[in-house]
């Protein structure tokens, strides 16, 4: 086949196996970043228009709304930013930054956003949809138990995708470039033909889904043909490879509105095409960088209609679009020149929250690449780092969880409010703010002094009930999502039979742990209202705090996580999904805190909870390394969806010279991951910078920071979210 000329290997030519293609053809790069080029003239023209549009968008929230057509892979006319200058084409609608309504997920709430922004959606289109279909948000409330409704209303368990798209699915968009869509359709037809023996409910459902996938692949071909491209065949050069890949991602965007839409781990794959083109004399380094820069620009143009509730759950208005960089095979890294080119787009296009670059860190990374990443971190707080699991095609799904591309999918199971769990243990299963009964069988504690043994016993009862409800909640949501808003194109680019996982998060861990430490190692008095509900707590002695490398409190943290996972692992989940637990928050620490009473650790009523695995703000005062050592004691074996850790470091703590700072960043990352760390993101800044951004938002429109596994534009946060980020520990010593 002409498109595969000079490519090595045979297995990948006979079956779908992108890993085999990469391992037979990629070239590890260990050199420096000296080869990189700046922005091309064409890219400069494209990005200049985007910057103006983004600036305008920031003043009015939503720049434009499609009010005649609903979402769909092939539902919109072509869209361009600057047609003559674009080398990678395609937009989610016919104009840049123009959002659409996805009726299959959240019709009525989206139409309210449309109305609030001064638009009126075509009534006939809405009525036709309602006559023949239903939105997830319309039907899902009827399927909830009363317990689920109560837990959602009281902010005990939230964040599940019942009024937004699921997201977190890593699809193998590379397959389009390597094989062409016709090959993929033929493979799906072959799979469909095999699904005909011993017909039962499971096989019927799979057959129905495969048919939807085939239809989506045909829609994908049609959408690409509008732009003048025939993606039925494999890509024949680097430009086509990136364009084909992008068309797949764009199709996913057009039928979705998920919180996270990961792109995968694409740099080694694309690099193979770029290196072949450079060798053949049809591509220069400047043109190679131009391809990557313009691909990144397209990712930065993705927008969805977001409800106020969504913005409370997830920080920032833009979706989490994660591009993973790294990987290891046979003691050799998957770092290529294109890994550098992706990160160089930050320099060329300036800092942004998209893509969410995730670096898989390991001892096998070339030293020069470690240096380059550290230099990027010093100048821009945009990278996150994860411990490499040493697989070829592993990609980050959203914040810290990883999946094998094309082989596994994650269902998001929401986050549990651990601070509420503690207060229910203290208040006999009653909600501390409303007084209504929430959990039965919890022994009331009427004494003014809290006894650790009684609290611990009650906490186990509370957690069992909360996990029961969370499991039911997740199973219902994903059944309804599959039935009414199935992600046809994303699943079409995965194996027909995939490993399914369901991921759960816990929020407020350090609040719970510090509170239990206070109860165990201090004398904690409870203040109660006239109904006997706790309103405040007073600790009469100092007590050990999580984040200071103190075994007595760090063990409490480890035991809590193990207990949570032990209970969770006894549950059965939708489509036999395997459970994964993560310590993360996705921004829900703020909304949870705003609906949670005072806690025994000294946290005031309605104050935000700590983010993810972070210690409580400003109590981890023994230095950065002590804080990280506490986190390293958390049981990573049961937290297979990640332990999200965000740290703020003042520049002076890293050294007075740039070379010293770079060396210290590398040392921090090497030591943390060598000792079993899972995830780490660094904000290198002074608190005053955060305060300046808080008080002068219009001057800091491009101020980006890291939080809970995401790069976030500070100006896109609510005031409560900004407050929670300003009030963080800023480590001045290592």
Q: What is the predicted function of each stretch?
A:
Residues 2-734:
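Conserved catalytic cores of very large enzyme subunits
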């Amino acid at each position: 086949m002409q498109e595969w000329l000079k490519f090595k290997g045979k297995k990948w030519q006979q079956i779908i196996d992108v890993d085999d293609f990469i391992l037979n053809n990629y070239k590890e790069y260990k050199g420096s970043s000296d080869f990189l080029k700046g922005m091309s003239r064409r890219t400069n023209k494209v990005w200049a228009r985007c910057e103006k549009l983004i600036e305008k968008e920031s003043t009015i929230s939503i720049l434009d709304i499609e009010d005649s057509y609903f979402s769909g892979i092939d539902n919109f006319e072509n869209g361009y930013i600057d047609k003559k200058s674009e080398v990678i084409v395609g937009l989610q609608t016919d104009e840049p930054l123009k959002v659409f309504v996805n009726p299959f997920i959240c019709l009525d709430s989206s139409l309210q956003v449309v109305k609030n922004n001064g638009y009126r959606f075509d009534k006939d289109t809405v009525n036709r949809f309602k006559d023949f279909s239903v939105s997830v948000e319309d039907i899902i409330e009827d399927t909830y138990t009363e317990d689920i409704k109560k837990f959602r209303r009281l902010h005990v368990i939230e964040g599940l995708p019942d009024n937004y798209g699921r997201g977190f699915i890593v699809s193998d968009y590379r397959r389009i470039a390597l094989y062409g869509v016709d090959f993929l359709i033929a493979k799906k037809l072959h799979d469909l033909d095999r699904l005909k023996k011993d017909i039962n409910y499971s096989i019927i459902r799979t057959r129905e889904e495969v048919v939807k996938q085939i239809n989506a692949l045909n829609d994908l071909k049609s959408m690409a043909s509008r732009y003048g491209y025939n993606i039925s065949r494999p890509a024949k050069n680097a430009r086509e490879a990136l364009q084909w890949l992008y068309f797949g991602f764009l199709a996913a965007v057009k039928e979705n509105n998920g919180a996270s839409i990961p792109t995968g781990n694409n740099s080694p794959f694309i690099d193979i095409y770029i290196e072949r083109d450079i060798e053949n004399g049809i591509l220069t380094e400047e043109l190679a960088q131009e391809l990557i820069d313009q691909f990144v620009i397209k990712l930065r143009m993705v927008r969805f209609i977001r409800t106020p509730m969504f913005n409370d759950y997830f920080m920032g208005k833009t979706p989490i679009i994660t591009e993973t960089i790294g990987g290891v095979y046979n003691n050799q890294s998957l770092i290529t020149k294109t890994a550098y080119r992706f990160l160089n787009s930050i320099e060329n296009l300036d800092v942004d929250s998209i893509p969410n670059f995730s670096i898989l860190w390991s001892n096998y990374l070339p030293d020069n690449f470690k240096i380059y990443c550290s230099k990027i971190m010093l100048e821009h707080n945009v990278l996150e780092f994860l411990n490499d699991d040493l697989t070829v095609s592993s990609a980050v799904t959203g914040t810290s969880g990883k999946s094998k591309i094309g082989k596994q999918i994650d269902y998001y199971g929401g986050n549990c409010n651990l601070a509420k769990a503690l207060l229910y243990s203290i208040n006999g299963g009653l909600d501390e703010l409303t007084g209504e009964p929430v959990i039965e069988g919890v022994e009331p504690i009427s004494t003014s002094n809290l006894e650790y043994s009684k609290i611990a016993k009650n906490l186990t009862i509370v957690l069992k009930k909360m996990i029961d409800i969370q499991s039911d909640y997740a199973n219902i949501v994903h059944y309804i999502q599959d039935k009414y808003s199935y992600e046809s194109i994303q699943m079409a680019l995965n194996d027909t039979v995939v490993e399914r996982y369901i991921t759960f998060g816990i929020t407020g861990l350090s609040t719970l742990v510090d509170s239990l430490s206070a109860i165990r190692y201090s004398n904690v008095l409870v203040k109660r209202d006239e109904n006997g509900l706790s309103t405040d707590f007073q600790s009469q002695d100092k007590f050990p705090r999580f984040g200071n490398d103190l075994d007595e409190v760090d063990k409490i943290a480890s035991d809590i996580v193990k207990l949570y996972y032990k209970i969770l692992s006894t549950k059965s989940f939708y489509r036999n999904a395997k459970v994964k637990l993560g310590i993360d928050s996705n921004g829900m620490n703020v909304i949870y805190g705003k609906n949670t009473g005072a806690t025994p650790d000294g946290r005031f009523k309605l104050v935000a909870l700590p983010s993810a695995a972070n210690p409580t703000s400003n109590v981890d005062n023994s230095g950065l390394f002590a804080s990280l050592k506490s986190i390293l004691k958390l049981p990573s074996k049961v937290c297979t969806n990640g332990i999200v850790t965000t740290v703020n470091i003042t520049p002076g703590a890293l050294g007075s010279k740039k070379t010293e700072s770079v060396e210290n960043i590398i040392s921090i990352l090497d030591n943390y991951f060598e000792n079993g760390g899972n995830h780490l993101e660094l904000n290198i800044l002074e608190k005053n910078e955060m305060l300046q951004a808080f008080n002068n938002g219009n001057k800091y429109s491009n101020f980006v920071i890291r939080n809970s596994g995401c790069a976030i534009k500070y100006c896109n946060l609510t005031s409560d979210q900004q407050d929670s980020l300003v009030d963080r520990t800023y480590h001045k010593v290592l």
